[in-house]
Amino acid sequence: LDGKLARPPERPGLLHNYRKTGRLPPIYLMFIECSAVISTRLTLICHARTVAQKLARFPTNEPVENQPLKLGALATQFANASLLLCGPELRTRQTAEWFGAAPQVDAALRDCDWGRWHGQAIKDLQVHEADALQAWISDPQAAPHGGESVMQLGERVARWLTSLQGMPGHIVAITHPFVVRAALMQVMQGAAFNAVDVEPLSVVELRFNGIWRLRLPGIDLAGAL
């Protein structure tokens, strides 16, 4: 129902029967139950491109590469959002400022902890730590870099999603590719983590109305997201 209630069909005698028996028909109970569900809209936005992404390196706390020319146009995209969140890193805070003046930092949106691989090029790891890299790619519980495993990241993101379920309104969160992927895996209940690519400034929208659902926005031909 996407947060909207249709009017149940009128049938003669229903109210009379309710007054007599104290019971509502199942269709009325369904509408009452739907109206009690809090509707949460969550828009996840990946931070803008960084030099590390271009060079296929694990990230450091680096800035975004370029600033868009039309900042005003970006700010209007989610002007009516009830809450603007971002991860604590410089790149997420910079990107969040394009969409609103006062983003709120949420530590749960931080990037995966890459341990000693921070700043390391993947091509170098393929030479010097090939077995460790392969273990990390193939096993979500593996953390050969000494940081956070993919499974631990997923558990963190799952707790964060649960915390949002009682928050009505539209929440916009600027975060990292791996956090977005982990959120999608929680919603889809799938194991295809490595089959999802999250491009810089890509937008993913999730909605909670009893259960989390992935919503793929259409393209606005007038130029909006």
Please tell me what each predicted stretch does.
Residues G218-L225:
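Acidic, His/Gly-rich catalytic cores of divalent-metal-dependent hydrolytic chemistry
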